[in-house]
Swiss-Prot record:
Pathway: Protein modification; protein ubiquitination. The gene is RHA2B. It comes from the Eukaryota. SMART domains: RING. InterPro entries: Znf_RING, Znf_RING/FYVE/PHD. It is found in: Cytoplasm; Nucleus. This is E3 ubiquitin-protein ligase RHA2B. The ring domain is sufficient for the interaction with NAC19. The lineage of its organism: Eukaryota, Viridiplantae, Streptophyta, Embryophyta, Tracheophyta.
Length: 147
């Protein structure tokens, strides 16, 4: 089945974004290993990419043309939402430009830009994080030396 089977419902526009997020996470991890080798954090890349893929897919599926006459602002770009623009309303009822929310997600922010409520329910956020394989080996933070 592999990666292709898992990403079959993700738009082709989302794949470069996921690869970019993976590369950014990899370089951030390598940098942390070089700068702070004894306290390097455990990075679970597959979990973050899974959440990113889910969010990009939801953003694509649940975006719509804005038609409200009320003067609302997109808190990400600080512009007024105009009739006919592609927007996405989150579960917390906040509305953003579709492209602005995608940019927010590219930075691995999985919460509302305004109220910080999680974009995915807690039971879904934890899904896969225990079962996923870390892309980097676990580092012991204990003071005992094995040399």
């Amino acid at each position: 089945m592999g990666l292709q089977g898992q990403l079959s419902d993700v738009s082709s526009d989302s794949i470069p974004l996921m690869l970019l997020a993976l590369l950014a996470t990899f370089f951030r991890h390598v940098r942390s290993l070089l700068l702070f080798p004894s306290s390097a954090p455990v990075v679970v890349v597959t979990s973050n990419l899974s959440v990113l893929a889910d969010q990009l897919n939801l953003n694509r599926l649940f975006s719509y043309r804005y038609s409200d006459n009320a003067a609302s602002d997109c808190i990400v770009c600080l512009s007024k939402l105009k009739t006919g623009e592609e927007v996405r309303k989150l579960d917390c009822r906040h509305v953003f430009h579709k492209q602005c929310l995608e940019g927010w997600l590219q930075h691995l922010n999985f919460n509302c830009p305004l109220c910080r409520s999680p974009l995915l329910p807690h039971h879904h956020q934890g899904h896969g994080s225990d079962a996923s394989i870390s892309a980097f080996p676990l580092r012991s933070t204990s003071t005992a030396s094995s040399h």
